Amino acid sequence: MTEKFQKSSKNIMKIKQKKICAALVVLAVAIILCGVTKWQQNQAEIAMEEAEMERMADVPPLYAGILAEIRQNEMVLLEENQEVLIAAAERAAHPENNVYTFLQGPKSWSEGRTWSGEWSNEYVKGNYFGSFGCGLCCMANIYCTYTDYTCSPWDMYEYARQVSGYSPTRKVGAIGWADMKVTLRKCGFDCSLHNKPESYEKFQEQIKNAKGAVVLVCSRDDDTYWENTGGHYVNISLYNEETDEVFLGDPGGPSRNREFIPLRYVYDALKTASQYQYMLVNDYREENNEWKQDGIDENWVEP
């Protein structure tokens, strides 16, 4: 009985082993067939890609050609306009380079300082231009900076005599606020006259929103920056919010001219004894420019 059971068990094991072997063979064959199929598919795809590449080799590369042509044209434009682009970049990096800041005095002219000119030696009713021309220099700075034209401070003197009530005397040669505003209006500028506000923040905001300003400073009000100055017109522009500074055009101070200074210095030194303390340059309109003077005839030291 036991022998029969053992033989039967061995037979069952053999049968199972045969079935397992058969299954393994089938699985192996399936794997091989799958691999062959995948390889065939890859080969077919490679063949299609090669055929497509051969076909495209005979076709003009339209889009690639267009891109290449565009890039070539861009390079040509860059080369042709290199100086213009460099100048534009320079203007963006250093906007103060576009601001005119004429000097009024004969000493600056005799020393050959940049921005000085022979107008300093013009003689009017007992006074040399160098002793009274700060306001006219400021006006010429505005005209040359914000228009496409140029003029000298002496040109501005002659025009102010024509279109406003400006009439210098032996005692007073400087131009007044009203005549300054009228003359610049004839040049196309919208300007407004102001008194020193009680709040520094209000002054800040006004300067920030204006193209620039002519301000009247006096060391009797504050001598932190200007010393021994009874009354002197200067230009300020290019207000910088981050530093709270402005670019200074000082016709009578060659060592101060073209410096960035704290706006607070200007506010503190505004001449309160004057009818007005500053004039804002708000806008320029070409169609309102009745003068259109262009060119400087006098000898001067250009930057």
Q: How would you name each of these model-derived features?
A:
Residues 195-249, 253:
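Active-site-adjacent substructure of cysteine-protease-like catalytic cores
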Residues 137, 141-149, 159-163, 183-190, ...:
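Structured segments of extracytoplasmic/periplasmic soluble domains
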Residues 44-54, 100, 239-303:
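Noncatalytic regulatory segments and standalone regulatory/sensor domains
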Residues 10-27:
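N-terminal Sec-pathway targeting helices
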Residues 1-11:
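N-terminal targeting leaders characterized by basic, low-complexity, disordered sequences
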Residues 126-135, 148, 172-176, 195, ...:
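Extracytoplasmic/periplasmic, Sec-exported soluble proteins
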